[in-house]
């Protein structure tokens, strides 16, 4: 039964008070900067770390700093590597005559999971996007061209996302590469605008197998 003598709460139009101390709020803010991490997930991650023993938190921080300081780019293909030349480029069993071009290392790792490609890679570091001020000169295109003759490249596979930026980059590269080698592009088994890293292994394997020559 409702009692009229009890105080009633009115909707507050005031800005809510900060519920986290500043150090915790800063940690949450940093997690929110990560791709795919929303406010709630950021809070869960931050609170989880604080509940762990201090040595685990230190190990996490040390691993993060070590990766940031020691991991760079392969001088040949642009993939992430702790050495001047990455493991893939050093592998004598890889076919250096076939280069698969990807936008970034996440796409490379997705293709490697399929175990269907035994050639080499080249990481552009992005896609041509005039709207974002990213032109061809900002990408690793020149190093790709420099690999064609020394490595006797016979085919370049364009494994770029089916998007406006991916199509623009593919057309630009095809025009540059076709005088020197065969240029193919992975089949469109991927939804338009989708990212390669989110595609399942079977879809990626079929996209590689069904690649087509760029006219």
UniProtKB/Swiss-Prot annotation:
Name of the protein in its database record: Recombination protein RecR
InterPro entries xref list: DNA_Rcmb_RecR, Rcmb_RecR, Rcmb_RecR_Znf, TOPRIM_dom, TOPRIM_RecR
UniProt xrefs under PANTHER family: RECOMBINATION PROTEIN RECR (PTHR30446:SF0)
Record function comment: May play a role in DNA repair. It seems to be involved in an RecBC-independent recombinational process of DNA repair. It may act with RecF and RecO.
Listed GO biological process terms: DNA recombination; DNA repair
UniProt keyword Cell membrane, yes or no: no
PROSITE patterns documented for this protein: RECR, TOPRIM
Superkingdom: Bacteria
Organism field: Synechococcus sp. (strain RCC307)
UniProt entry keywords in alphabetical sequence: DNA damage, DNA recombination, DNA repair, Metal-binding, Zinc, Zinc-finger
Zinc fingers typed C4-type, residue spans: 74-89
One Pfam family from the record: RecR_HhH
Similarity comment: family membership: Belongs to the RecR family.
NCBIfam families noted in UniProt: recR
Domain Toprim: from-to ranges: 97-191
Any one Gene Ontology molecular-function term assigned to this protein's record: zinc ion binding
